[in-house]
Amino acid sequence: MTVCRPVTWAFAAALMVAAVGHARAESPEAGGRERQWYLVRASKDFDAGRFERALVNFEAAARLSEAPLPEEAVRRWGIAASEAGWPLAAYVRLSQYLSAMPGAAGREQIQVRIDRARRVLLDIAARQSRVIVLTETRHSWEASGERQVIRLVAKDGRATVEALSGVRVTAPAWERAGQIEEGAYVGLIARLLDSPALLDEYPPQILDPNEPGPRHAVVLRLVLGPEERVRQALRGEPFDKLQALAQLILDFSRTVQTAP
C-alpha cells in the first residue's frame, strides 16, 4: 500500500494562514456590531426553536472576532447543534461551556447531551471518519528540519493508517501504511475527543517570518461524518498542547498492529 504524500510545508502554512480568518475592511467597531447582530438573530432563532438557523448564526458570530462568545451563547450554540443533529458541534460547544461554568445550573442535563453526542461520534468514527496530522519544524541553525504526515481513515468498518516522517515527504526517513483493527482506531478517536487540545479555543496565530529560532507548525484535522474540527498552532501553550496530541497520534501510528 503506497503512502499518500500530498502535503508540503507550503500547504500547511497556507492552511494556517487561511484559518486565521478573512481580513475585513470595516473597523473593529463595525465588526463588533455585526457580531452582536448575529448573536441577536441566533438567540431569536433559538428561542423560536429554529435550531439549524440558530447554529448558523452562532457560527457566524464566532468567526467575526477573536474574543470568545459569552458562556450563555456557547451553551445555546451547543444545544442548537444537539437539537439540529450535529453531534461534533454539540460535543465541542457543550464541553467548552461546562469547562468554563463547572457549577452551572442544569449541568446534569448538559452532561447528558455531551455523553449522547460522544456515543454518536464514536459510532460515526467506525463508519466514516478521518484524522489528519501535519507537523513541521523548519530548518534553522538551532534545529534540523523535519516533517511528519499522518492520515488515519475509517470507512464502513475498515480502518487504515498512513504515516511518514523525514526531512522531505517525497523521500521520508520512515513511513508506514496498512489496515488496522477498528477497535484500536475508535479507541484513538475516543482519546482525541477527551483531549483539551481538541476542545480548547485560543486566538489565531499568524506565521511571522522574522520570528527568531526554529519555526514550528502543527495542524490537526478531525473529520467525523459531515463535520470536522481543525486545530492549528505555531507557538506557546497552544502549540505545546497540540504537539503533544500529535505525538500521541504518531506513537499510535508507529505501534498499532497492521493486518498482514
Would you name each region that the model predicts?
Residues 9-18:
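Bacterial N-terminal signal peptides
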Residues 29, 61-69, 98-117, 146:
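Short solvent-exposed coil/turn linkers within tandem alpha-helical repeat scaffolds
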Residues 31-60, 64:
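Alpha-helical segment of the N-proximal tetratricopeptide repeat
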Residues 58-82:
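Short, charge-rich amphipathic alpha-helical segments embedded
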Residues 112-148, 197-260:
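Short, well-ordered, aromatic-rich surface patches in folded extracellular/luminal domains
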